[in-house]
Structure formats: C-alpha cells, structure tokens
Amino acid sequence: MPRKAKVVKDLKHFPKYATRQKNRCPICGRPRGFLRRFNMCRLCFREMALSGEITGVRKSSW
C-alpha cells in the first residue's frame, strides 16, 4: 500500500497540460505553430530564416 500512495502522490506533481508546456517556443513563448525540427514557432522561424540566422534554410522560389 505505501508504494501505491507514493505513485499517486508523484502523479499530482505533473502539470495538467505537459505537452503544451513542452512544445512552446523558447524565444517568444508561443504555444501554437511549433516546429519541432527547429525548436521554435513558425513566426520566429520565418524571421530568423529571412535574416539568415538559420543555416541551410532558404526561401523557396520556382
């Protein structure tokens, strides 16, 4: 029984929306439009890509 009580106690410390906390842009804190590959939101990605701060990223044109 003590082990079960410890597990229940540990579960109370987890945030309710853990995924939303994890997938936030570290630059602006935006929770939506998150790009996992670059670990930032789409707006910060666009600004940094256009200014040339992200290597290997170019604006596409055809």
From Swiss-Prot:
Keyword rRNA-binding part of the UniProt annotation: yes
SUPFAM superfamilies: Glucocorticoid receptor-like (DNA-binding domain) (SSF57716)
Entry's cofactor comment: Binds 1 zinc ion per subunit.
Molecular function terms, GO-annotated: rRNA binding; structural constituent of ribosome; zinc ion binding
Keyword annotations of the record: Metal-binding, Ribonucleoprotein, Ribosomal protein, RNA-binding, rRNA-binding, Zinc
Assembly and binders: Part of the 30S ribosomal subunit. Contacts proteins S3 and S10.
Record function comment: Binds 16S rRNA, required for the assembly of 30S particles and may also be responsible for determining the conformation of the 16S rRNA at the A site.
Name of the protein in its database record: Small ribosomal subunit protein uS14
Lineage: Bacteria, Pseudomonadati, Aquificota, Aquificia, Aquificales
